Amino acid sequence: MSKVLVLKSSILAGYSQSNQLSDYFVEQWREKHSADEITVRDLATNPIPVLDGELVGALRPSDAPLTPRQQEALALSDELIAELKAHDVIVIAAPMYNFNISTQLKNYFDLVARAGVTFRYTEKGPEGLVTGKKAIVITSRGGIHKDGPTDLVTPYLSTFLGFIGITDVKFVFAEGIAYGPEMAAKAQSDAKAAIDSIVAE
């Protein structure tokens, strides 16, 4: 039995293409892997605080007493990291906003990236500590950006996930959804076909 963590990060709720596709993924996965446990965390409806000068002090080893706000941030960081490490498959629904990921998803990453916990520095360079996972990124875009200079989502997510130790990453693209109903429908159809292929593996 595997444990699957689904991270939603769109601000558009039910109108979101990435949310719709991640819901489709969950439906298909449950149909094919009924014994697996699935956890869904919506980073828009349950937002993560923005990392600032006060909160970053909570995430670094220190003997200094923590403020109540720092204590809350550290507890949340511990919770998010424990959840991440407890799951085998990580599904990230990542819409493109202004060429990059949403603020909601970036805030999540800022709280799970902790030296000595999810990565460490060695004589040979950084080493990820969140290993043995598979990641599936479902990314939606209004335009066409894949393999082009305007796609900052794909390299960023590949780099971040690899940095913390998740190197088995597959991407599902839904592009051109702002180019009209026909193009949007094709984007959804192509993305669902890619999801079907991944689920069937």
Curated annotation (Swiss-Prot):
The keyword Flavoprotein applies. Disulfide bonds: none annotated. Keywords: Flavoprotein, FMN, NAD, Oxidoreductase. It catalyses: 2 a quinone + NADH + H(+) = 2 a 1,4-benzosemiquinone + NAD(+); N,N-dimethyl-1,4-phenylenediamine + anthranilate + 2 NAD(+) = 2-(4-dimethylaminophenyl)diazenylbenzoate + 2 NADH + 2 H(+). Binds 1 FMN per subunit. Pfam families: Flavodoxin_2. The keyword Cell membrane does not apply. It comes from the Bacteria. FMN binds at residues 10, 16-18, 96-99, 140-143. Quinone reductase that provides resistance to thiol-specific stress caused by electrophilic quinones. Also exhibits azoreductase activity. Catalyzes the reductive cleavage of the azo bond in aromatic azo compounds to the corresponding amines. Homodimer. HAMAP family: Azoreductase_type1 (MF_01216). Belongs to the azoreductase type 1 family. This is FMN-dependent NADH:quinone oxidoreductase. It comes from Escherichia coli O6:H1 (strain CFT073 / ATCC 700928 / UPEC). The lineage of its organism: Bacteria, Pseudomonadati, Pseudomonadota, Gammaproteobacteria, Enterobacterales.
